[in-house]
């Protein structure tokens, strides 16, 4: 599919390096440097998931860790499944496979979406704390469907085949956030002779300077 919502130039992506990825069984194209969210938006994908309880359609709302809607399942095989990954924080790579965590038979045509139209009357806030209490022996059955309605991702049922790097290190000053303020604070602390570690959720430093 063409990237119908992609600007012809600008941004910090490499348009010479095209990457293929799959979302909900449909193959799309993006560029190196895209986040998964950016690539989905560029391809005109606006429904990413469904809301809790009422199953109303939800799209990408934010740009980072604060994203409330685009929480996806990542992984091409059972062993590599990663639940609850925010599309705004996931870098695009060749062969990435992502799926919505709810919506049946699919996220665009969710049968539970009817609750979004009548749910306010039939399901007032907190109704499940009263409705599903009896008989007590049925709770495990109720719980299975309530969890599915919550839209939570699932953990893999096979062992993770990947290995991970780790490091134990010590410092005098830990600075969280590598934007302009964090970098300035780190420079000042380092000039005083302190051992400084800068931690940031992004792949590179700079924040709003980039």
Feature locations, PLM:
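Signature of N-terminal electron-transfer/Fe-S-associated modules in redox systems
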Residues: 1-152, 160, 169
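Conserved active-site and cofactor/substrate-binding residues in soluble primary-metabolism enzymes
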Residues: 31, 35, 184, 191, ...
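N-terminal glycine-rich anion-binding loops that anchor highly charged ligand groups
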Residues: 13-15, 198-203
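N-terminal Rossmann-like FAD-binding beta1-loop-alpha1 element of flavoenzymes
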Residues: 167-198
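Conserved N-terminal glycine-rich FAD pyrophosphate-binding loop of Rossmann-like flavoproteins
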Residues: 203-210
């Amino acid at each position: 599919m063409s990237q119908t919502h992609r600007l012809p130039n600008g941004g910090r992506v490499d348009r010479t390096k095209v990457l293929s990825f799959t979302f909900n069984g449909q193959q799309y194209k993006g560029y190196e440097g895209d986040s998964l969210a950016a690539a989905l938006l560029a391809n005109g994908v606006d429904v990413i998931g469904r809301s809790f309880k009422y199953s109303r359609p939800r799209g990408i709302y934010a740009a980072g860790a604060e994203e409330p809607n685009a929480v996806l399942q990542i992984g091409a095989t059972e062993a590599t499944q990663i639940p609850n990954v925010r599309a705004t924080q996931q870098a695009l790579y060749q062969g990435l496979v992502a799926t919505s965590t709810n919506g049946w038979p699919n996220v665009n045509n969710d049968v539970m979406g009817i609750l979004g139209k009548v749910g306010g009357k039939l399901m007032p806030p907190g109704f499940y704390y009263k409705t599903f209490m009896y008989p007590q022996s049925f709770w495990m059955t109720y719980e299975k469907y309530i969890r599915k309605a919550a839209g939570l991702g699932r953990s893999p049922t096979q062992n993770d085949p990947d290995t991970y790097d780790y490091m134990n290190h010590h410092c005098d000053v830990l600075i969280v956030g590598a934007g302009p303020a964090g970098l300035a604070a780190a420079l000042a602390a380092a000039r005083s002779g302190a051992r400084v570690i800068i931690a940031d959720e992004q792949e590179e430093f700079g924040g709003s300077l980039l």
